[in-house]
Regions:
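Accessory, non-catalytic peripheral segments of nucleic-acid enzymes
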Residues: 3, 220-338
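Structural alpha-beta junctions
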Residues: 78-80, 110-113, 176-179, 274-291
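Short, conserved loop/helix-junction motifs that constitute active-site signature segments
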Residues: 76-79, 139-142, 171-176, 250-252
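Structural motif
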Residues: 8-10, 49, 126, 145-149, ...
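Conserved beta-sheet core of the metallophosphoesterase superfamily
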Residues: 159-227
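Active-site environment of divalent metal-dependent phosphoester hydrolases
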Residues: 15-19, 56-59, 86-97, 131-134, ...
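Core catalytic region of metal-dependent phosphoesterases/phosphodiesterases
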Residues: 4-7, 14, 18-119, 173-177
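Conserved catalytic scaffold of divalent metal-dependent phosphoesterases
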Residues: 69, 87-172, 197-200
Length: 338
């Protein structure tokens, strides 16, 4: 039997057009693709797998974003013998069918194979975003590798929230495969034979402090290797007291930083700190967050205190809805795609 690839370079969830079609984000995507290609060539990778969510906005693609993403895929097309390009949920116009998606045009590029239907060849299965009851097929399937864009229960959607179990697709349905590699959840994580490889680079404060993203290199029948993009933007949350003790060590270039004001300072002092630290450490964003005094007074040592992001709060509230009142899976999907 021939192998589908010798050495493959793999990445996922780049989300061109994120942050209201931010030029900064699209430029980051371009720079990531350049680094990805350079690293793949150093590792002698002839094949590329993209595991889904090329674009972010599923209803409409901004023309400038489209130009950025087209240039990125043209670079990939010129750099690999074959590119297996999975259609993710953010690439689809409809939630429940894959016949209309934002990367249809890519089939005209040399070497690009659009995976908008299940693909099996040479002991490898490639699975796009699953719709309907397609997941039932997995129970009888087996092989060496799966590349996919799966939404499996009990894996982390972000640093704090696990995917609920809706009693449909289960990790055990993939037991017939040696190794499963997936996009969709941005946090790199592994359970048994299933690995979410982590997205291209951090995108928001849900990724704060977690830089294990970038690309995977997989040589056939070998263990995967992971590479982080050295110039990836980073997200951090600190207390002001810690930043003042070690600004050079904590404030990294091209970072997005939130600082909790855990010490008493005036508005003028806060403004001065922000105006000084941002250019001095080449930060992209610096936000100062006041801490309510009544909260800290009632809990002076901050014991048993957990700070939650807006994402965490909303997703927890959706999960707490009464069974049968709403389709919680649909509500979560709608919220994550906003």
């Amino acid at each position: 039997m021939t192998n589908l690839f010798k050495k493959a370079a793999v990445f996922t969830d780049i989300h061109w057009g994120l942050k209201n079609n931010s030029i900064q984000h699209n430029t980051d995507c371009t720079n990531f693709v350049d680094w990805f290609i350079e690293t793949a060539k150093k590792q002698n990778c002839e094949t590329c797998f993209f595991l889904g969510d090329w674009h972010h906005n599923r209803a409409a693609i901004n023309i400038q974003t489209l130009q950025f993403s087209l240039r990125g895929l043209e670079k990939l097309s010129a750099s690999f013998d074959k590119i297996y390009f999975i259609v993710g949920n953010h690439d689809m116009f409809y939630r429940d069918k894959r016949d209309t998606h934002s990367v249809e045009w890519a089939k005209h590029l040399p070497n690009v194979i659009i995976i908008d239907e299940w693909f099996s060849q040479d002991d490898v299965t490639i699975i796009p975003w699953i719709v309907g009851d397609e997941w039932k097929r997995l129970k009888k399937m087996k092989g060496k590798y799966v590349f996919s864009h799966l939404e499996l229960p009990n894996f982390f959607m972000n640093a704090m929230i696990q995917m609920p179990d809706y009693k449909e697709i289960q990790s055990e349905h993939l037991n017939g495969y040696e190794s499963v590699f997936s996009g969709h959840f941005h946090k790199r994580q592994k359970k048994n034979n299933i690995t979410y490889i982590g997205n291209a680079f951090p995108h928001n404060y849900s990724d704060a402090g977690d830089d294990k993203r970038g690309m995977m290199m997989l040589e056939w029948d070998k263990e995967p290797m992971y590479f982080g993009w050295p110039n990836a933007p980073k997200y951090r949350v600190y207390n002001l007291s810690d930043v003042l003790d070690d600004p050079a060590g904590l404030l990294l270039p091209d970072s997005y930083v939130k600082i909790n004001l855990d010490i008493d300072i005036s508005f003028e002092e806060a403004s001065f700190i922000r105006e000084k630290l941002m250019p001095e450490h080449h930060l992209r964003e610096l936000t100062l967050i006041p801490i309510k005094r009544d909260f800290t007074d009632n809990n002076p040592d901050n014991t048993n205190t957990q700070f939650e992001s807006v994402d965490t709060i909303i997703q927890t509230q959706i999960e707490s809805l009464e069974v049968g009142t709403f389709d919680k899976k649909l509500l979560l999907d709608i919220y994550r795609n906003i």
